[in-house]
Curated annotation (Swiss-Prot):
Region (Disordered) location: 35-67, 399-443, 665-719
Name listed for the protein in its UniProt record: Forkhead box protein K1
Effect caused by changing residue 333 to A: Decreases DNA-binding. No effect on transcriptional repression
Record-level GO cellular component terms: cytoplasm; nucleus
GO molecular function, one term: DNA binding
FHA domain sequence ranges: 109-161
Function noted in UniProt: Transcriptional regulator involved in different processes such as glucose metabolism, aerobic glycolysis, muscle cell differentiation and autophagy. Recognizes and binds the forkhead DNA sequence motif (5'-GTAAACA-3') and can both act as a transcription activator or repressor, depending on the context. Together with FOXK2, acts as a key regulator of metabolic reprogramming towards aerobic glycolysis, a process in which glucose is converted to lactate in the presence of oxygen.
A Pfam family that the UniProt record links to this protein: FHA
């Protein structure tokens, strides 16, 4: 009993818990409940005690019980009083030893050795290694703190805590051990388990509910759908809307921007809600194994910004990415190299060396503080899909505003179509119908088409020009791809002129037909048309413009003369740049003309063969007039593209015979060059010999020759 009396703390409490229903303990509890009221009567009871001794055998059981209670009262009263003091309030923590368990219900508890100088809340025995006031536990919501008051210190989870050290924040569970002893106390916090679980989830809903946004699906589809084309011919879903078109383009952009911002806010809210729910519930990582729509830099920003101290090691970044995005768990390890490259090359990521005091190895990575807010804001912004970009050509309002047609859309120009379908950017009017029904089918064999307009100041600015752009030229096969017979009928001559255009595969040809008659087929009139008042019996004249190949697709100037016959047609053929070694195109004009009367002789105008040079039209023939107003006009027109022209004048012997004809000879393809001969016969004089310049091989010379006939200048021949 002396042992119980000495240790009136923990052992008495242990006895109470071991037998809570014992009558001895009930009596002790009753005695402790009335300590002040029962203390005066005991001194008055001893005098009548001795007379009552003989009467003890009768009521024997009751006095024995009371005697037992009186002998054990000094040890148990203190424990019962301590339990009564601790009863109010919930338990904050639990302290467990080998033979006791103590519930901490007060904000401050003292642990030490019990002595006569002062009491402690939890006595650990009479060991001299334990101070009278050794430890002090204090609770400051929501953490517990330990302060060491004993001179020997204490071990907390193996870490020594000396006397006078700052208060140590305790974890949820830890173990105290007194030095030089085997006495241990197991500490367990009960505050978090009883009150904390329900609190984090309740304030989550008021924060998320205002961010819920409902966007009607039909309205969104109508906003996102592409604007229909005015002509209804071509629809490009991914093309950018043209700003000059439509009055609602600005409002469309505004609504689209607002819609994208709302969707972005909704995505942020949903992602934040999912992350908070996952953290609060302690659930598993997401199960979506698809590749996340974020760049490596965004993944790095997400990982670093989620850290508590805003810095992570390379392994920490890897762990964060694999935890939140399961795709990278099974993916090839090449993404780790990309993460390292982004960290090293991106100027927004700063490498911070680890201090010597910090354990571990490897440097930390941080985000540049100047750009951290902006990068964190864009960390969860999904990347946009790469669409078809729009290119605007700098050729003014008549140029194309959309991308050219690709080879995968062969239906742009079909052989059965009534007209050529053009993009809406060209013109709102229909394109002209091809003159030849087979032209569409022949142009359809070319993989790609481009549309352009002539310069506004040109004579045919209102006429669209079809430019067929074939693939790269092939030197192996020289197969003609265009053969267009046409008929030119003049008002004076019912017979037709056959025009054959033979074009090789790599050649790009642009043909324009311009007529001067008011009721022509196409209705385009030459702007530089001169006076046509004079009437002469002349045949239809064809002008060929085959310019220098180095000019490519540039527009060739048209040589205009003083007068143009009423039914003349101008045919211009412009050749593109050709690869070396690829044969050029050949244009052959066969023009049978009526003989022109000069005195009593008929001078037939023979066929003109041209290959790559300018052909000069024969003007109206009158007496005492040159076919060309001046030889300098021809030289000036051909100075940039052809060799110098040699002009030979042939004068007639007779005084009354007018000029005959003008002829220009150039390089012909397989046939020898044809020349025009002026024959004038007079009595007793021989004919003038024809000028024939041929090489031994049968090919024409490279230097063209022009011969003109003039009026009578007296007898003799001038050269």
């Amino acid at each position: 009993m002396a042992e119980v009396g000495e240790d009136s703390g923990a052992r008495a409490l242990l006895a109470l818990r071991s037998a809570p229903c014992s009558p001895v303990l009930c009596a002790a509890a009753a005695a402790a409940a009335f300590p002040a009221t029962t203390s005066p009567p005991p001194p008055a009871q001893p005098p009548p005690g001795p007379p009552a001794l003989p009467a003890e055998p009768g009521p024997g059981p009751v006095p024995s019980t009371v005697a037992t209670a009186t002998t054990t009262a000094p040890a148990l009263v203190a424990a019962a009083a301590a339990s009564v003091r601790q009863s109010p309030g919930p338990a904050l923590a639990r302290l467990e030893g080998r033979e006791f368990e103590f519930l901490m219900r007060q904000p401050s508890v003292t642990i030490g050795r019990n002595s006569s100088q002062g009491s402690v809340d939890l006595s650990m025995g009479l060991s001299s290694f334990i101070s009278r006031r050794h430890l002090q536990l204090s609770f400051q919501e929501p953490h517990f703190y330990l302060r060491c008051l004993g001179k020997n210190g204490v071990f907390v989870d193996g870490a020594f805590q000396r006397r006078g050290a700052p208060a140590l924040q305790l974890p949820q569970q830890c173990t105290f051990r007194f030095p030089s002893t085997a006495i241990k106390i197991q500490f367990t916090s009960l505050y978090h388990k009883e009150e904390a679980p329900a609190s984090p989830l309740r304030p989550l809903y008021p924060q998320i509910s205002p961010l819920k946004i409902h966007i009607p699906e039909p309205d969104l589809r109508s906003l996102v759908s592409p604007i229909p084309s005015p002509t209804g011919t071509i629809s490009v879903p991914n093309s950018c809307p043209a700003s000059p078109r439509g009055a609602g383009s600005s409002s469309y952009r505004f609504v689209q921007n607002v819609t994208s911002d709302l969707q972005l806010a909704a995505e942020f809210a949903a992602k934040a809600a999912s992350e908070q729910q996952a953290d609060a519930s302690g659930g598993d990582s997401p199960k979506d194994e698809s590749k996340p729509p974020y760049s490596y830099a965004q993944l790095i920003v997400q990982a670093i910004s989620s850290a508590q101290d805003r810095q992570l090691t390379l392994s920490g970044i890897y762990a964060h990415i694999t935890k939140h995005y399961p795709y990278y768990r099974t993916a090839d390890k090449g993404w780790q190299n990309s993460i390292r490259h982004n960290l090293s090359l991106n100027r927004y990521f700063i490498k911070v060396p680890r201090s010597q005091e910090e354990p571990g190895k490897g440097s930390f990575w941080r985000i540049d503080p100047a750009s951290e807010a902006k990068l964190v804001e864009q960390a969860f912004r999904k990347r946009r899909q790469r669409g078809v970009s729009c290119f605007r050509t700098p050729f003014g309002p008549l140029s194309s505003r959309s991308a050219p047609a690709s080879p995968t859309h062969p239906g742009l120009m079909s052989p059965r179509s009534s007209g050529l379908q053009t993009p809406e950017c060209l013109s709102r009017e229909g394109s002209p119908i091809p003159h030849d029904p087979d032209l569409g089918s022949k142009l359809a064999s070319v993989p790609e088409y481009r549309y352009s307009q002539s310069a506004p100041g040109s004579p045919v600015s209102a006429q669209p020009v079809i430019m067929a752009v074939p693939p790269r030229p092939s030197n192996l096969v020289a197969k003609p791809v265009a053969y267009m017979p046409a008929s030119i009928v003049t008002s004076q001559q019912p017979s037709g002129h056959a025009i054959h255009v033979v074009q090789q595969a790599p050649t790009v040809t642009m043909v324009r037909v311009v007529t001067t008659s008011a009721n022509s087929a196409n209705g385009y009139i030459l702007a530089s048309q001169g006076s046509t008042g004079t009437s002469h019996d002349t045949a239809g004249t064809a002008v060929l413009d085959l310019g220098n190949e180095a000019r490519g697709l540039e527009e060739k100037p048209t040589i205009a003369f003083a007068t143009i016959p009423a039914a003349s047609r101008v045919i211009q053929t412009v050749a593109s740049q050709m690869a070396p070694g690829v044969p050029g195109h050949t244009v052959t004009i066969l023009q049978p003309a009526t003989p022109v009367t000069i005195g009593q002789h008929h001078l037939p105008v023979r066929a003109v063969t041209q290959n790559g040079k300018h052909a000069v039209p024969t003007n109206s023939l009158t007496g005492n007039a040159y076919a060309l107003s001046s030889p300098l006009q021809l030289l000036a027109a051909q100075a940039s593209s052809s060799t110098p022209v040699v002009i030979t004048r042939v004068c007639e012997v007779g005084p009354e015979e007018p000029a005959a004809a003008v002829s220009v000879a150039a390089n012909a393809a397989p046939t020898p060059a044809a020349s025009t001969t002026t024959s004038a016969s007079s009595s007793g004089e021989p004919e003038v010999k024809r000028s024939r310049v041929e090489e031994p091989g049968g090919t024409a010379t490279t230097q063209p020759t022009a011969m003109a006939a003039t009026g009578p200048q007296g007898p003799g021949t001038g050269e």
